């Protein structure tokens, strides 16, 4: 059953990125760098926190999560994703390492909150880290593959793959740290 879900997730990601690439070709759009915005550090952190909260909350609601669960996931996701983004920008951490630390943070926070919110840990952690899935990296990889810029495409795909692998590893490591029964093989 797990392999079926993995294949479905892969198909969804590929179809979404391919659709975005085709629309970009039709509309003559191409990926560009981010616009430089002059904000003090506190402003960046606050806006990233708010955007992360809204993104995770919206994702949770879109998949029919009850409001209390969506708020819990959004709170965890806002903290974890803001930490991830700040690690990349302020400390120049590799994006995959920052994703691992972000997912680890989300997993630890979910473990601390699970009894208070009354939902299983996985119900809170999955929506809280979906915002960390590297959609932009996948899009840039697919776009560059489509225009036959293979070296650039491989770079974006490799970065995306490392981040995608780091997310569940962060959650697993958090579970190992916080759940004594999960640490041992029976």
Residue ranges and their predicted role:
Residues 36-51, 92-104, 162:
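Structural signature of hydrophobic alpha-helical transmembrane segments
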Residues 121-122, 126-132, 136, 142-159, ...:
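Transmembrane alpha-helical segments and their short flanking loops
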Residues 61-72, 115-123:
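Membrane-helix interface "capping/anchor" motifs
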Residues 13-26, 49-61, 77-89, 103-115, ...:
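Transmembrane alpha-helical segments of multi-pass membrane transport proteins and ion-pumping complexes
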Residues 29-48, 55-63:
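A glycine- and small/hydrophobic-rich beta-loop-beta segment
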Residues 27-41, 144-155:
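Membrane-interface helix termini and inter-helical loops of multi-pass transporters
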Residues 2-5:
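Short, small-residue-biased leader/transition segments that mark boundaries at the very start
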Residues 71-79, 125-131:
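Central hydrophobic cores of alpha-helical transmembrane segments
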């Amino acid at each position: 059953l797990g392999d079926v879900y993995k294949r479905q997730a892969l198909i969804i990601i590929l179809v979404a990125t391919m659709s975005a690439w085709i629309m970009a070709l039709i509309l003559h759009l191409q990926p560009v760098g981010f616009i430089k915005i002059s904000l003090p550090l506190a402003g960046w952190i606050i806006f990233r926190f708010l955007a992360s909260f809204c993104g995770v909350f919206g994702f949770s609601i879109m998949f029919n999560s009850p409001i209390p669960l969506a708020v819990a996931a959004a709170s965890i996701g806002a903290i974890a994703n803001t930490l991830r983004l700040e690690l990349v920008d302020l400390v120049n951490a590799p994006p995959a390492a920052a994703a691992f630390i972000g997912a680890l943070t989300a997993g630890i926070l979910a473990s601390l909150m699970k009894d208070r919110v009354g939902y299983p840990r996985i119900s809170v952690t999955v929506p809280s880290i979906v915002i960390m899935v590297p959609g932009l990296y996948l899009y840039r990889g697919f776009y560059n593959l489509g225009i036959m810029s293979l070296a650039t495409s491989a770079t974006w795909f490799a970065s995306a793959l490392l981040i995608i692998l780091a997310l569940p590893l962060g959650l697993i490591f958090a579970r190992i740290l916080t759940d004594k029964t999960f640490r041992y093989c029976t």
